[in-house]
């Protein structure tokens, strides 16, 4: 790359000017923050070769290599693509998909977060939009991946049910439930699903396997963001399936493309047209 930089175009592709037109930060595409040890070693080598040897772990689980000269962007891109970590995206596009570990790494996980994040990345990463759109996948209502402050957030949930003939009234599930959603009833238990957040902790602690998962699914949030004008997301689906996840993201992008004002985040578009009207357009 020897011609005059087009900073906006470069930024969209993951090359971010540091203020000095000679140097750029190169942002890598790392869906769900997953890397092999071999990739990490090679990224370190590339950072020494083209930058100043330092790396930055981004808030969205990506990696940035600073102090890369403009004239080296072509070569560093070739090296990064060769190890499966090409430059990512910035600016008005679908950003790096983030996730918590989920199943099987986390004992609280209800879903395979990495797998879902990778599918979302394959379908939607780098799509051009009026402004940025961030997607996060979290394995349970502990919300470690912060779905409520992403433009689209997906949370793994499981609805419990009890086999009363197996219940010994030990009380472990009652003491475990942080929502007060399980109560003793006639020497057994009952669920209050108005209070239950579908975390699945009661299923995991039951010593007799009396509590099991009736169904698993995805709670879906839209319209969250932080930044200068933070907004908590709206929950629009409590138990969706995987197809619903993809459909909603696709429809959010379509509505965003058609109706967003330049620079307007998804949540602020929702505030402008109303959550009811927005839900009609995407469900």
Model feature map: region roles:
Residues 172-191, 197, 201-218:
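Iron-sulfur cluster-binding cysteine motifs and their immediate structural context
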Residues 261-281:
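Bimodal "functional hotspot" detector
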Residues 138-143, 159, 172-175, 189, ...:
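Short acidic/polar capping segments at secondary-structure boundaries
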Residues 1-8:
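Long, contiguous juxta-domain segments that are non-catalytic but functionally important
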Residues 16, 152-156, 218-225:
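Short beta-strand elements
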Residues 216, 224-260:
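A hydrophobic, small-residue-rich beta->alpha segment in the mid-to-C-terminal subdomain
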Residues 8-34, 98-102, 233-234:
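Short glycine-/aliphatic-rich beta-strand segments at the starts of folded cytosolic domains
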Residues 2, 26-160, 164-168, 172, ...:
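Small-residue-enriched alpha-helical segments and adjacent helix-cap loops
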């Amino acid at each position: 790359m020897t011609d005059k930089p087009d900073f906006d175009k470069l930024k969209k592709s993951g090359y971010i000017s540091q203020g000095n037109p000679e140097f750029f930060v190169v942002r890598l595409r790392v869906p769900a923050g997953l890397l092999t040890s071999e990739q990490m070693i090679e990224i370190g080598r590339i950072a020494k070769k083209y930058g100043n040897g330092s790396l930055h772990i981004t808030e969205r689980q990506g990696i940035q290599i600073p102090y890369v000269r403009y004239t080296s962007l072509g070569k560093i891109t070739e090296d990064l693509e060769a190890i499966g970590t090409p430059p990512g995206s910035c600016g008005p596009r679908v950003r790096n998909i983030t996730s918590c570990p989920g199943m099987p790494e986390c004992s609280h996980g209800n879903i395979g977060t990495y797998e879902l994040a990778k599918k979302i990345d394959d379908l939607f990463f780098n799509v051009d939009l009026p402004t940025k759109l961030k997607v996060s996948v979290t394995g349970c209502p502990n919300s470690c991946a912060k779905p409520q402050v992403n433009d689209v957030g997906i949370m793994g949930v499981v609805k419990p049910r009890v086999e009363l003939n197996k219940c010994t009234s030990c009380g472990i599930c009652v003491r475990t439930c942080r929502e007060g959603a399980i109560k003793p009833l006639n020497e057994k238990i009952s669920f209050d699903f108005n209070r239950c957040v579908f975390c699945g902790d009661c299923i995991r602690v039951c010593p007799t396997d009396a509590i099991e998962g009736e169904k698993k699914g995805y709670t879906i949030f839209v319209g969250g963001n932080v930044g200068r004008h933070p907004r908590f997301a709206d929950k629009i689906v409590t138990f969706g399936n995987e197809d619903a996840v993809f459909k909603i993201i696709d429809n959010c992008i379509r509505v965003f493309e058609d109706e967003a004002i330049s620079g307007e985040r998804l949540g602020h578009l929702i505030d402008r047209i109303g959550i009811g009207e927005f839900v009609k357009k995407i469900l």
